[in-house]
Amino acid sequence: MLRTTCYCLLLAFFSMGTAAAQRSKDDSQETKLLVMEHLWNEAQVNRDSRALDGLIGSAFVNTEWDGEVSDKSKFLADIKDPQFKPASMNVQGMKVTFYRTTAVVIGEYRTKGSYQGKTYDHVGRFTDTWVFQSDKWVCVASHSSLLKK
């Protein structure tokens, strides 16, 4: 009986240590993902398709606020479009949820700029799905929904 009790206590102790280590690892990965989200926004404002190319996976799919769906090549081409002139993009209220080697980041955004000579000021929510592959996080899907025009 004593042996069983000791075994259970040791198992509980090591499980708590493993859970704490996992939380620490998740916190570190969460910080990385939040930084990458900010880098993504900076790259969009600077129309830096090369930086964005390094953040998104080869099978990336993007669903815009207006319902347009694009793959990686179209998304990157749109960033380079000279008629696309973003002035600012800010995110807030981000939350990261992990599912083993996948993470979902949700948050709110506000972006201002002009496209084809027309100004825009969008406020919305986004969902980005990131996968850890080849020792790095890459975004494989992004979706935005407009809250206010």
What residue spans do the PLM features occupy?
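A beta-strand edge to alpha-helix "cap/lid" segment located at domain peripheries
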Residues: 7, 22-149
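Bacterial N-terminal signal peptides
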Residues: 7-17
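Positively charged n-region of N-terminal signal peptides that target proteins for export
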Residues: 1-5
